[in-house]
């Protein structure tokens, strides 16, 4: 079942977490391309210095100011597309970046990282930007809540955003090999769960008895 618009019409950070484990689907010329979402980032409101919306409703970011449940697809580095889903109430510019996913059907490329994910599912700005995610070609399917724990951390490559760069608004499924970059603390958490190494046996002094 496709996620309804009401799913997206919530706080961006809530949606970013709730999208983990859901399935992104693109019906590309009759070919189903699908992947399970394992990593997201929230971009919340016009004051978020890491968000495109900080400059207002520019031609590029205008979709973020529109109704929730739309695809916001843009180009970075002139070569890679990134897909976001617009969230929150209309007029409050917010979106969730889909950073990585686990391949399921018809993926053309690695799905680790936002540019790779769009390439794998053949998602392109010229065809998919502004698309209603309740439509027939590009949508997110519901799925049971993930069994994996959710880890959080700062967003990637937003050092220009000052204090906003440290907000823990990146969400990922712990242990997924498809996450683009494990959030800080994930490795430490894995190490903490690992069994402790046995203590070395003390050496017996020479000449001592059994």
UniProtKB/Swiss-Prot annotation:
GO terms for molecular function: alkylbase DNA N-glycosylase activity; DNA binding. Residues 201-210 have a biased composition (Basic residues). GO terms for biological process: base-excision repair. Keywords: DNA damage, DNA repair, Hydrolase. Its EC number is 3.2.2.-. Residues 186-196 have a biased composition (Low complexity). This is Putative 3-methyladenine DNA glycosylase. It comes from Anaeromyxobacter dehalogenans (strain 2CP-1 / ATCC BAA-258).
